[in-house]
Amino acid sequence: MEKERETLQVWKQRVGQELDSVIAFWMEHSHDQEHGGFFTCLGRDGQVYDHLKYVWLQGRQVWMYCRLYRTFERFRRVELLDAAKAGGEFLLSYARVAPPGKKCAFVLTQDGRPVKVQRTIFSECFYTMAMNELWKVTGEMHYQREAVEMMDQIIHWVREDPAGLGRPQLSGTLATEPMAVPMMLLNLVEQLGEEDEEMTDKYAELGDWCAHRILQHVQRDGQVVLENVSEDGKELPGCLGRHQNPGHTLEAGWFLLQYALRKGDPKLQRHIIDKFLLLPFHSGWDPEHGGLFYFQDADDLCPTQLEWNMKLWWPHTEAMIAFLMGYRDSGDPALLNLFYQVAEYTFHQFRDPEYGEWFGYLNQEGKVALTIKGGPFKGCFHVPRCLAMCEQILGALLQRLGPAPLGSLPAVPTREGSK
């Protein structure tokens, strides 16, 4: 037990120090003091290389800052909250393409003019997360009204009428359900329902619906999890049907673990661990170089995506959360060992001890392919969310072990030593 305690304590200190470093990077380099919001196109040293603003990443950074402010005493800093509020007001003013319509842009200029719209729900989802978390830290009801109105619009698009998304219904297009849609909705159900009984009750049926739809992606008698299935939960033909995304499956896994914990369903929990944690890890982990492949083909054919064998930052952060949460909920030591395996690889390969933050894109061998720290898809989200959640779970695990004997805790490593 003492060896376990020592290892957990070392990792708690390690992720906590890394979280401090990562947030310091974004606070120093990403804030737009003129217009509000955040620059995410940042080079290795934090230099801004493009001033476009991506609505997904604006919402994510507002959410991240607010979540840290609300749940970590050391992040209860006025400059963090002020930046989050400025980002939230930027979103309120500019994210929607044609107010009072709810459709949000994907890309905005620095001063908020729309550049591009995606015909999906994801800009709106991250907008909702940002507004709800802003309400939780400020108590200002206009943020919560905005969150609930947007949530209800998203539900309408997904479950009743998608016409407002602007996607043409072409005769040759397969009716497809990507796992990302029920995943994101389940995440929003968790977000809005946290410590809010009214919202929990309002969206309970939606949470059940989302979980059921995600579980339909387990196919071939439980041997694979597919990224896309038909609307009635069957495997689709061709590359689209065989497409697998191990990192996405692992992320869905910890979303589902939260759902199973809320439901008090240990049988579902075990199924999730087997199919959404262990299955994608064992098929997706590169046995030669380590790390998770980005994409795979369920029949072991060559994937068509050029980046299929690259190692990206976010599948590894999601794996860290999933395995640590799985261990917390099940007590299975194999899951804790997998957390350590993924975390060691991730910290060694992605961290940049010289300039801070993490590289996002490695080649198959684990060498840095892109030196940027942020871009159209990488912002202040997956890395700090992972570090914050892991620090909290590790703290809970240490509490579960009880107080340490006097003199048994390891010394806290210095920031230099942790590099």
UniProtKB/Swiss-Prot annotation:
Top-level EC class: isomerase
Q: Which GO terms describe its molecular function?
A: ATP binding; enzyme inhibitor activity; identical protein binding; N-acylglucosamine 2-epimerase activity; peptidase inhibitor activity; purine nucleotide binding
Marked site, Important for enzyme activity, at 380
Q: Give the GO biological process terms.
A: carbohydrate metabolic process; N-acetylglucosamine metabolic process; N-acetylmannosamine metabolic process; N-acetylneuraminate catabolic process
Q: What is this protein called?
A: N-acylglucosamine 2-epimerase
Q: What does this protein do?
A: Catalyzes the interconversion of N-acetylglucosamine to N-acetylmannosamine. Involved in the N-glycolylneuraminic acid (Neu5Gc) degradation pathway.
Q: How does it assemble?
A: Homodimer. Forms a heterodimer with renin and inhibits its activity.
Q: Which InterPro entries match?
A: 6-hairpin_glycosidase_sf (IPR008928), 6hp_glycosidase-like_sf (IPR012341), AGE/CE (IPR010819), AGE_dom (IPR034116)
The UniProt similarity line reads: Belongs to the N-acylglucosamine 2-epimerase family.
Q: Which pathway does this polypeptide act in?
A: Amino-sugar metabolism; N-acetylneuraminate degradation
User: What lineage does UniProt assign to this protein's organism?
Assistant: Eukaryota, Metazoa, Chordata, Craniata, Vertebrata
Q: Which organism is it from?
A: Rattus norvegicus
Q: In which tissues is it expressed?
A: Kidney, adrenal gland, brain, lung, spleen, ovary, testis and heart.
